[in-house]
């Protein structure tokens, strides 16, 4: 009996040790366990090598860094993924989700890598990157004026191929040609046609999403609540976007100007004050923007000095004569002449405002829109405010003077007017709520080259943001998801389901729409698998 008891005890110990070892091995080797699981979704091992990159792969760092557009996040101390998956088929996305869940890894989804806080490729816990660079199909139907665009397609590629099909069609989307459709449409997406047709997200009519269960859903199968949430609510909180179906829009030739003003600040603020009071009131066919940056100049005495260069730039869906007449009647202080204006095709307008050509060039080669490496950035930080009433001239003097506190050319402000159709769209039409009552967006941007200068420049932009508190939107102070800013709040890392904590930043991005997003999240991802520092949390189970 004693022998039997001992034998039973010994066998139990062996079994316990065996299972403990396997559990510990599973925990200790999440990368290997993920790869073993993922191999089931890749029947050809040769193909697998082109889809999966681990830290042992000589191409790993090249793939990781290739679409990091903010060099703040390329240091040796920046957390790196255990695995990068570059799917070429939806089944690879399904496998990544299911295997990441199985072995306890988080997912970061990267389409173009333009997340200003690096959240599409950084996590503080072990993670996998799903890099959608190979999911870039664009299928255009000119007859119905729609297009299916996969998440990894760049805006430049979409503009290019739509123009190839019909030069009188385009899309209501952004300026930067290397931004990809996945994140841009999922976060809102403003651009030169915003006052005519709304945001990129306002023009989504269907979507393909892989959900937490690995199922591929379209608008019909996902339901209207989830479809609503994806369009401007940050699709990464709900699954992985495979493709958007977007509405294409009619575009005539456009007229543009970009005039530079160099003058004393007290004179300049009078122009700015005039702009504040009229830019949002213009007919929707005119977009009049302005931005400010410091440059070195030589004065009349031949001395070098630093001056603020102010640019007033337009996009007008009409002819030169009409624009000059309108500007001379409404804003004669700018002194716009015919010689300041250029009439361009819409595709050339996009090329100009993409920043890859000079204003006076006649060489608008649209092939540049296909260059996925164009316009690589240095280190930068962006913050944004929404302005609901004109800022006093005396305050704008102080705002502009603060540009001199930053390195020459490193700091910039930009003012982007609302109005037009944005006033007509309900704040609850999609999660993006910033509509009627907004005069303009005010961007604060700083950029630099050396990692060791990070704190210096971050302090400058945070100081100007704090200074602006009394003069911008409040209760809450509004923000824009596609200019993500972790300074405004993050989820509790110890309790990522904390609704109260998430509401701090959530209402700044989404206003009253935040609670509806939480309800959708609770229904479709109740265990909060798709999460990051600013992801929508589910409600606790007892509050469902």
Curated annotation (Swiss-Prot):
Glycosylation-annotated residues: 45, 65, 168, 296, 304, 328, 498
Regions crossing the membrane: none
GO cellular component: apoplast
Needed cofactors: FAD
Family annotation (SUPFAM superfamilies): FAD-binding/transporter-associated domain-like
EC number: 1.21.3.8
Keywords: Apoplast, Disulfide bond, FAD, Flavoprotein, Glycoprotein, Oxidoreductase, Secreted, Signal
InterPro entries, A to Z: BBE, FAD-bd_PCMH, FAD-bd_PCMH-like_sf, FAD-bd_PCMH_sub1, FAD-bd_PCMH_sub2, Oxid_FAD_bind_N
Signal peptide: 1-28
Location in chain, cross-link 6-(S-cysteinyl)-8alpha-(pros-histidyl)-FAD (His-Cys): 114-176
pH dependence: Optimum pH is 5.0.
Miscellaneous comment text of the record: CBDA synthase might contribute to the self-defense of Cannabis plants by producing both CBDA and hydrogen peroxide, but since these reaction products are toxic to the plant itself, CBDA synthase is probably secreted from secretory cells into the storage cavity to avoid cellular damage.
SUBUNIT field: Monomer.
Protein name: Cannabidiolic acid synthase
Organism of this sequence: Cannabis sativa (Hemp)
